[in-house]
Amino acid sequence: PLPFGQRIDRDAPVTAQFDGRDLPAFDGDTVASAIVASGQWVVSRSFKYHRPRGPLTFAGHDVNTMVQTPDAPNRLADELPVRDFPITTAQNVSGTLMADRNAIIDWFGRFLPVGFYYKAFFRPLGIWSFWERLIRWAAGLGVANLSITPRYTDKQYLFSDVVVIGGGPAGMSAALAAAEGGARVLLVDEQPCLGGSLTYHRFAIDTTERDQLAHELMAAVQAHKHIRVLSNALCNGWYTDHYLPVIQGNRLFKVRAKSCIVATGTSEQHVVFRNNDVPGVILCSALDRLIYHYGVAPAGGLVVLAGNDQAWLSALTADDAGMAVAAIVDLRRAPDETALSEEAARRGITVHCSATVYTADRDPKTQSLRAVSVRAVTEQGQVGDVIATLDCRVMAMSAGYMPAYQLACQAGAQ
């Protein structure tokens, strides 16, 4: 029930297929959310060693979700609506996704370092031409459909006083401030609806203030006559004299503005440990999106690895959604907010402070997470003995945030 599953319509079921397997889903689901909802975490295989890969961000910020559609390869499954892409397949596999014959390459990984093929296969003289053909055959991910008819595309010119990139709380506030000053504002957001982090991020134990702020800002933006909103739109450049190409569907908007405001938010950072690429290991923000946007609460137990208080809040969200939270493992001695540890204790959630996940264990049958090994942090950069081995199917982690500054950097900002 709401507030979980904001983007799906449970009265509009959709039948999709991934790799020949039926996926029950709802209108509003993405291919990735439907796959995870079906109980499977593996979506793709890594390029070189063919290790199993699963979603990490559920925001289109990682390549783990690349799949093949009938018309194009390398499409991000966490950005593909199942309504528009009912048939998708895995790519870069020999055999099936779950039984990839090329996964044997991973067994010899220690003998295949980065760039080894630039230093080998050159003797005896003339042998390189033979190896080059094999390497080129093995390269690549998906398959290009050369018989596909190119889709219709068009362009439109837009002029605005102020363009705001990003429809989160900062972007909506900036758009409202500019519009109240009399400016014509164009608000561009890559998500299907406004709100940004307000639609999934938990800022406090009590979510009332967040929900109220989200409702007020979105209502004010939609009602303002001087603000035009482009949702599901990507601004992929910022050029001289505030020329901004914005792509929405099959249309390219060539936007000119007097000024531009970038409010693109942040990207969550992962934690480094052994086997942190195992499917089922995700970011805390990805878990929040999965629950709030698509109403998916994966079964099998959850471990949260915390480097900040936000991870604790994600654990509370998962508990609210009915997930079995096995433990919170905090790299610090304690959370900054004592109310969080008190709330976790009240809910009966096990907590390991001054500890870290040292390694993740992969289930050979499901090719996804089975358990994590927890060790005590003894000093800076040092760990002690194993203090717990926790069975889980999902591990969410958060180690801080980095500004999504790519657009500003492309424009020359430093």
Model-based region annotation:
Residues P1-Q414:
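Residues forming the flavin
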